[in-house]
């Protein structure tokens, strides 16, 4: 019952503003700034009044946090208005190309156990390989997003890369077809654009 502009965070005073940062993130469009509302009855009931390591947010805020899905995701809460004026957090509206995107809905397959007793994963009638090296793949896509941001990629191009990163980060855990995401989002072309720009 929290709005898209509110956060339940018992460790912070009501009315203060918090930047919510989840790592890795694709850019400032994945950093919502929310106002603390510690009077929300549903949040008090669910989290309690004394929690130091849990906050409550709206599902739309979670979507914006680089695909947080309420399965134990970690978010840093950074107050945005300190008296010394040292903390300045940039935020911008979410990318249109990310609205409503759900990696599990788009890339989760169906498990079948073969005659050999091993699990096989299928999507659209085709078997696909599961991800085994999340850190490596996440490093690749994070570096690409950083490079794209530096060279001034369009919002559409950034959305393609970030959608793929959302699939990659959950691919191993939720058995997602990350290779198909790589094709659908034409990640190879994005890599080529970065190479051409830096050459």
Where are these regions (language model features)?
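Core mixed alpha/beta domains of very large multi-subunit molecular machines
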Residues: 1-76, 84-92
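Conserved catalytic alpha/beta cores of large enzymes that bind or transform nucleotide phosphates
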Residues: 67-68, 73, 83-85, 93-190
């Amino acid at each position: 019952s929290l709005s898209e502009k509110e956060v339940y965070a018992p460790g912070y005073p009501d009315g203060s503003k918090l930047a919510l940062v989840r790592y890795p993130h694709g850019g400032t469009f994945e950093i919502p700034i929310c106002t603390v509302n510690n009077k929300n009855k549903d949040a008090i009931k669910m989290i309690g009044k004394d929690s130091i390591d849990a906050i409550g947010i709206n599902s739309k805020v979670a979507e914006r946090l680089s695909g947080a899905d309420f399965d134990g995701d970690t978010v840093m809460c950074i107050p945005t208005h300190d008296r010394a004026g040292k903390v300045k957090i940039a935020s911008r509206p979410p990318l249109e190309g990310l609205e409503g995107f759900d990696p599990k809905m788009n890339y989760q397959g169906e498990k079948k156990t073969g005659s050999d007793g091993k699990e096989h994963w299928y999507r659209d009638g085709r078997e696909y390989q599961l991800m085994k090296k999340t850190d490596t793949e996440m490093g690749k896509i994070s570096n690409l997003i950083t490079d794209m941001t530096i060279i001034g990629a369009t919002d559409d191009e950034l959305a393609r890369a970030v959608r793929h990163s959302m699939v990659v980060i959950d691919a191993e855990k939720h058995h997602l077809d990350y290779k198909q995401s790589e094709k659908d989002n034409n990640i190879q072309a994005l890599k080529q654009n970065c190479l051409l720009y830096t050459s």
